[in-house]
Amino acid sequence: MNVDEFIMKIKRRETPFYDRLYRIAFAARHFEVPLVRGLHDAGYHERRFRIATWRSFWRAAYYQPIFRSRCARCGKNLHLMNSGQGIPVIEGDLRIVIGDNVTLYDRITLAGLTVGENPTLTIGDNTMIGMPIAIMVGGEVSIGSNCLIGSNLIADNPGHNLDYKRRFQKLVKIVIGKVKIGNYVFAGHQSMIVGNVTIGDGAIVGVNTVVTEDVPPFCIVSGNPARLLKKLPFPKEMIEIVGEKEYQKYLDAKIET
């Protein structure tokens, strides 16, 4: 009788002997030290503190400096949220410009397309980019200041040639637009922003929303494809900041029912 056959006899509990072995193995598998509330609660907090301290050390001493080395410009007070990967994945020859007080999660991808010309990603001051976003840049993607971005994908291009015969050929030109995300924009979790798109200041993109057309400032869009659900109050002080043209877009926007 080989080992596998022996194990199967235990699992099947074929005789009182194998049944006894099964019970012993079951008890051993489910053994744990009894809970001591104060002791184990302290152990939980100790573990959290130890992990946070370890990650903070490596973030400051290693991950943030090497990420900065890949940026054309990186402002002060960059903060990489370390969830285990360390730094964002940077693919291709991407020019990265980052403002002050920017927070990025490490589990994100920033990619410059080889078919693009000088692909550039710009992120404004006080903006937070959550995970697990992929930002695909063929030309230019700009994200304004004071934004919260939880999108799944931001891309100024379709990723591949639309011609099925040329789709798998390397270095084939594709349609490249420009993604411009204004200031104070909130893009919800798993949303997608694709194509030649402008999202106005103060706009909100709902969870799982797919944006393929411009979004007026201070408007809420949701759905696939995105549709206008609500117009937010437009602060008077913002009219001068965004300009009359953008304000007119807000006035002209129609809520879709």
Language-model features: where?
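Conserved hydrophobic/aromatic beta-strand scaffold that supports enzyme active sites
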Residues: 210-212, 220, 228
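Short coil-to-beta microelement around the adenine-binding A-loop and adjacent beta1/P-loop entry
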Residues: 72, 178-179, 197
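Short-chain dehydrogenase/reductase
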Residues: 148, 186, 202-204, 220-222
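Solenoidal tandem-repeat scaffolds enriched in leucines and small polar residues
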Residues: 174-180, 193
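Domain-scale signature associated with acetyltransferase and cell-envelope carbohydrate enzymes
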Residues: 1-157, 182-184, 217, 226-230, ...
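Beta-rich strand-turn-strand
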Residues: 136-140, 190-204, 209-212
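Histidine/lysine/aspartate-rich catalytic loop segments that bind and position anionic ligands
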Residues: 144-166, 171-176
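Flexible glycine-rich beta->alpha loop in the catalytic core of nucleotide-sugar glycosyltransferases
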Residues: 153, 160, 198, 209-210, ...
